[in-house]
């Protein structure tokens, strides 16, 4: 697993969001983007993380960020997740793992003594020029917005 680092340029990609809209790296051009990767929609940690970002969405926008969530869930699962919790940001349905592998967040994990491949919960702050400004690899699901915003002051 070779995860993108600060200073790297984001890879080219094309996927769809929970509404079926096409999203590419070009949609990020000229914006500061928070791209958060989570293992699975509608699971406790992922729900806590996304709801915290939802609850602090206005603050994140005021700081100049556009938010996008990414998992390997289907468009339908992402839509159900977004609708259930009223998320104001797009959730990318990366079933082909193009974005996930491009950012280097797919790899071996351990849970309850078992090893398997999966998505590592990580967040990338992307500068307007498409380079990685910051990588958060120790995501605190219940206070993730604060982790992002604390670097602004």
Q: What is the role of each PLM region?
A:
Residues 1-153:
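Chalcogenol-based redox active-site neighborhoods
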């Amino acid at each position: 697993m070779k995860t993108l680092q600060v200073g790297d340029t984001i890879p080219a990609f094309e996927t769809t969001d929970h509404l079926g809209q096409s999203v590419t790296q070009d949609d990020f051009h000229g914006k500061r983007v928070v791209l958060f990767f989570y293992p699975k929609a509608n699971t406790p940690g992922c729900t806590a993380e996304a709801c915290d970002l939802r609850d602090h969405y206005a603050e994140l926008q005021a700081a100049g960020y556009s938010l996008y969530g990414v998992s390997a869930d289907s468009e339908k699962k992402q839509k159900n997740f977004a609708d259930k919790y009223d998320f104001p940001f797009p959730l990318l349905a990366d079933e082909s793992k193009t974005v996930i592998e491009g950012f280097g967040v797919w790899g071996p994990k351990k849970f309850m003594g078992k090893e398997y491949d999966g998505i590592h919960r990580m967040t990338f702050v992307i500068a307007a020029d498409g380079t990685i400004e910051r990588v958060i690899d120790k995501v605190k699901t219940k206070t993730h917005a604060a982790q992002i915003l604390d670097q602004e002051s």
